[in-house]
């Protein structure tokens, strides 16, 4: 097998298109143990996600975890599954469709979406953009805060997918948008709207996905970017520091992770007499297992069970128009001159094609 793939013949005078690929983490195709096993195997085999030496980790993963965890995880997914499928896939697809609608008048832009793990695969969607004539691709990892285990993993996967292409596209990545004014503004608006309907809580808890503490110690900026997001959001809401709490959820294994942990924090608040807490997850732009099941179900039960009176979960941004506006602005800013340059006219393209054919070009 050839190391580099054979490309379609280059056609002179063709339109140069820009591809925009939104990439989120991933989801199984069904809430079943059979579907969870390959998904978890791909996810937990990524050395960006689990930094334990392969010789130690892979036997544990394949011999123990993949024989026990899929069934437990399937039950959790089943509790949030919708008629349209996984909430994360549904929201990510809708976000891509809404961004595509913003560029509907342009023949030189294509918008699509993929998942880092599971389907639709990054490789398949990059191939589709190539087939559509995209010679420039902006990859948008849908993680507001950069982490090596999320954003960098998307970058790794794109590089892996392109290693066999002969005719490579221009590439750009959105590294993070944790302090983007539009993103912060949309978060603040979602909180204000919730409080207009339900009143204000005693505490607002912002729960971010956790990471092992050693990632912070080894220079990962994720922890700092989470706290910057929280500070900017609290300032936008005009909240005193004592009313805002930052915590980290989804701890896995026995290693020390970023602290404080979300569920124990909620239980402690209830025991200390905090009657109502509102929880939001600014690190997720789409509702998913970690928000709908872990926070809105498990953590709700833990808080109320510890003596809390009222628990409110404020949904992720999902398809909020102000968030889609912010995402569009970010895409346009990161794509830059790809979208602002004046494309050649039909006459100019035909002239270029004519010159190439006169010099002996086949297409």
UniProtKB/Swiss-Prot annotation:
Location within or outside the cell: Cytoplasm
GO molecular function, one term: metal ion binding
Binding site for Fe cation: 209, 290
Major localization class: cytoplasm
UniProt keywords, alphabetically: Cytoplasm, Heme biosynthesis, Iron, Lyase, Metal-binding, Porphyrin biosynthesis
InterPro entries: Ferrochelatase, Ferrochelatase_AS, Ferrochelatase_C, Ferrochelatase_N
Pfam families from the UniProt entry: Ferrochelatase
Catalyzed chemical reaction(s): heme b + 2 H(+) = protoporphyrin IX + Fe(2+)
Top class in the EC scheme: lyase
EC number from the UniProt entry: 4.98.1.1
GO cellular component terms attached to this protein's record: cytoplasm
Domain of life: Bacteria
SUPFAM superfamilies in the cross-refs: Chelatase
Function summary: Catalyzes the ferrous insertion into protoporphyrin IX.
Protein family according to the UniProt entry: Belongs to the ferrochelatase family.
Protein name, per record: Ferrochelatase
Recorded name of the encoding gene: hemH
């Amino acid at each position: 097998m050839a190391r580099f793939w054979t490309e379609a013949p280059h056609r002179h005078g063709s339109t140069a298109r820009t591809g925009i690929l939104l990439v989120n983490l991933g989801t199984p195709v069904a809430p079943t143990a059979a579907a969870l096993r390959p998904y978890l195997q791909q996810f937990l085999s990524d050395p960006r996600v689990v930094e334990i030496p392969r010789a130690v980790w892979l036997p544990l993963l394949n011999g123990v975890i993949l024989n026990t965890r899929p069934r437990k995880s399937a039950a959790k997914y089943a509790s949030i599954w919708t008629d349209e499928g996984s909430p994360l896939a549904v929201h990510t697809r809708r976000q891509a469709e809404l961004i595509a609608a913003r560029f509907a008048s342009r023949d030189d832009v294509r918008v699509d979406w993929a998942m880092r793990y599971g389907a639709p695969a990054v490789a398949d969607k990059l191939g589709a953009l190539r087939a559509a004539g995209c010679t420039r691709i902006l990859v948008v990892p849908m993680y507001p805060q950069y982490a090596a285990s999320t954003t960098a993993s998307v970058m790794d996967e794109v590089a892996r997918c392109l290693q066999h292409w002969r005719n490579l596209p221009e590439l750009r990545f959105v590294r993070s948008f944790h302090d983007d004014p539009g993103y912060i503004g949309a978060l603040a608006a979602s909180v204000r709207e919730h409080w207009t309907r339900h009143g204000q809580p005693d505490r607002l808890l912002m729960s971010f996905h956790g990471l092992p503490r050693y990632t912070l110690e080894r220079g990962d900026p994720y922890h700092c970017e989470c706290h910057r997001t929280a500070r900017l959001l609290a300032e936008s809401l005009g909240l005193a520091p004592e009313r805002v709490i930052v915590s980290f959820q989804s701890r896995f294994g026995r290693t020390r992770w970023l602290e404080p942990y979300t569920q124990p924090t909620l239980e402690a608040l209830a025991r200390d007499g905090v009657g109502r807490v509102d929880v939001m997850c600014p690190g997720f732009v789409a509702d998913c297992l970690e928000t709908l099941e872990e926070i809105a179900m498990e953590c709700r039960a833990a808080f109320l069970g510890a003596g809390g009176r009222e628990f409110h979960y404020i949904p992720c941004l999902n398809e909020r128009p102000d968030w889609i506006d912010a995402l569009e602005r970010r895409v346009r800013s990161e794509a830059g001159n790809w979208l602002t340059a004046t494309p050649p006219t039909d006459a100019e393209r035909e002239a270029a094609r004519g010159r190439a054919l006169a010099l002996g070009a086949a297409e």
